[in-house]
Amino acid sequence: MSGAKRCPDCGSSEIVEDAHYSQDQLVCADCGCILSEGLITTTVSEETSLQAVRYSDSTGENDSVTYCMKRGIIRVRDLCRVLRLPDGFVDTALSYYKQAVGLPLYRLVSIEKKEIIVGCCVYITCRQQQWPITMGTICSLIYAKKELFASLFMDIVQVLKVDVPSISLQNLVKSHCRSFKLFKDSSEVPPQYAEKLDTVSERTVQTVELAYETWLVTGRHPIPMITAAAYISWQSFQPSRRLSCSLSRFCKLSDVDMPPPSTIRLKELQETLIKLAYHLPWLKILSLNRKNIVQHLGDLLKHRALLLRRALAVTEAELSKGTEASSSTDQLNSTLVFLPPCVSNPKKRSRSIAFPCGDLDITGDEEISDSEIEQYLRTPAEMKDYQQVQSCISSV
């Protein structure tokens, strides 16, 4: 800083030297006026003594962007554009991506994992902003394996130390219902199959909430259950015209993919509705099945809180009696009305050797027969040692 000179414009004495490329110049720190510019080199000696300054060094852009990061940034923006996310989401996703790629842990990973990192950063942003989207949707867009995506997602959340809230089920249901073509005002939809989006979404939300309260959603992918609930809700408005339409045809007319577990979720949901229907007085006298239960969906959803309390009260009353029938699996399922599917229908575990009846309680103190011991004696040395031990025991 030079105290003798003053700025001719503002009179300030705050004069600093600023290096502009290879030339030095005096600049006023207050108003930015240039007092003197550096001289251009005119002699050979001056040109040989000076060194060229790179543009990145002179402008402060020392951090070079690699090809992989440039490609990843483009992929993040493309994925956000496909999902039609707001501009603020794009900036947040790019920030997370740059932080993740800059870590040594993800610097030398495979191309497949780098693509999954792009999806994870976008998915984290959507979850934080309560944007209804599932992990399966991201995986289908980037052609990634769900298991690998889930493991990398958990790792990135822990490494970046970000808070990821849970998905709002109501928003997810409404967002998924918007993708059904039958719920849109379109001339291509048959009149008997067309339905208003708001009406179907409201009933679908109530049906999914009922499934959640009866353990049909916990620990499972939500999209198959939402698809089954939307199908039942759509049928319930005009049962006479829509009962003949199958779930696969419904998804085909709606121009959406049918997840494979949707048929199983539909069956479970119908069985749950039948169990609840037996607690309504005007439905007890009817012969209900999986086909005609849809006609009474509105009544079941209207009185679902009362029906769930009655079902729980009946279950507690039967359990308090201590009936001997509780040991039977079939009668157990009829007594305990609502259980998680993993408890009501457990998968059979394969066993290499079946245990004989009555020998399930193994303590480790059982006697070992001589023939079984001989199976473990393979070499002559082991036989000799065994004979010596037996002789010592007999001599004692």
UniProtKB/Swiss-Prot annotation:
Function noted in UniProt: General activator of RNA polymerase III transcription. Factor exclusively required for RNA polymerase III transcription of genes with promoter elements upstream of the initiation sites. Contributes to the regulation of gene expression; functions as activator in the absence of oxidative stress. Down-regulates expression of target genes in response to oxidative stress. Overexpression protects cells against apoptosis in response to oxidative stress.
Zn-finger segments (TFIIB-type): 3-36
Quaternary assembly: Component of TFIIIB complexes. Interacts with TBP and forms a ternary complex with TBp and target DNA sequences.
Intervals holding Sequence repeats: 173-249
InterPro entries registered for this protein in UniProt: BRF2-like_C, Cyclin-like_sf, TFIIB, Znf_TFIIB
GO function term, MF aspect, one: zinc ion binding
Domain of life: Eukaryota
Organism: Xenopus laevis (African clawed frog)
An example Gene Ontology biological process: regulation of transcription by RNA polymerase III
PTM entry text: In response to oxidative stress, a Cys-residue is reversibly oxidized to cysteine sulfenic acid. This impairs formation of a ternary complex with TBP and DNA and down-regulates expression of target genes in response to oxidative stress.
Protein residues bound to Zn(2+): 7, 10, 28, 31
Protein's cellular compartments: Nucleus
UniProt record similarity statement: Belongs to the TFIIB family.
Keyword Cell membrane: no
Keyword Nucleus: yes
Residues recorded with modification Cysteine sulfenic acid (-SOH): 342
Keywords, alphabetical: Activator, Metal-binding, Nucleus, Oxidation, Repeat, Transcription, Transcription regulation, Zinc, Zinc-finger
Chief subcellular location: nucleus
Name of the molecule in the record: Transcription factor IIIB 50 kDa subunit
Listed PROSITE patterns: ZF_TFIIB
Regions annotated as coiled coil: none
GO CC list: nucleus; transcription factor TFIIIB complex; transcription preinitiation complex
